[in-house]
Design a protein with these regions (language model features):
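Short runs of predominantly hydrophobic/aromatic residues within well-ordered alpha helices
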Residues: 8-15, 29, 35, 56-60, ...
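N-terminal interaction modules that seed assembly of large macromolecular complexes
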Residues: 1-52
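Generic structural signal for hydrophobic core residues of well-folded globular domains
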Residues: 15, 21-25, 42-46, 63-70, ...
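A charged, amphipathic interaction segment
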Residues: 56-110
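Non-transmembrane, amphipathic alpha-helical segments
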Residues: 3-10, 44-55, 69-72, 76, ...
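Sequence-level detector for tyrosine residue identity
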Residues: 11-14, 21, 77, 111, ...
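Glycine-rich, aromatic-bearing surface loops/beta-hairpins
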Residues: 92-152
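Histidine (H) residue identity feature
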Residues: 36, 43, 52, 67, ...
């Protein structure tokens, strides 16, 4: 697994995947030390039935903060978000959390597409196009986050 500094978006998606895995297969919680530790954290944080680990939430907050900075400082980034905005608004409207952030919506989109692919379900060309745009935004954010972290 890549670490948070290497690719923060992949890190968040990985944590979400491990949370779902541990919920689906609780008997495998001790299969590796990493799974055991994540399961213990989920237990302590009271999210065995739903929700996300503080690790994931904190990483998401960092990504959202960077997103806010870039909206004010980077015209190309702002343009990419504006192109993606109608799709994000539609996605948010279809969820039980219509007020989620744009970055959480991008991550949720990619996570849901991953789940559909695991189920061997077809992805529409429109969804694939939005996936490409969301991936580009998250890639840029992750690279900028990485550059900021390694410059310290």
């Amino acid at each position: 697994m890549k670490g948070k500094r290497d690719n923060i978006a992949e890190y968040i998606l990985y944590l979400w995947q491990m949370e779902d895995y541990l919920r689906a297969f609780p008997k495998n919680a001790d299969a590796t030390p990493e799974l055991h530790d994540l399961n213990e954290m989920m237990h302590r944080e009271g999210i065995l039935d739903g929700g996300h680990l503080a690790l994931a939430q904190n990483a998401l907050s960092e990504l959202e903060d960077l997103h806010s900075e870039l909206l004010n400082e980077d015209a190309m980034y702002r343009a990419a978000i504006l192109r993606l905005q109608p799709s994000l608004n539609l996605l948010k409207a279809k969820t039980d959390r219509p007020t989620m952030s744009d970055i959480e919506a991008c991550l949720t989109l990619l996570y849901q597409i991953m789940l559909l692919r695991l189920q061997k379900k077809e992805i529409s060309p429109e969804t694939a196009s939005v996936q490409t745009q969301a991936t580009q935004v998250l890639t840029f954010l992750s690279k900028t986050y990485h550059d900021n972290q390694t410059a310290v």
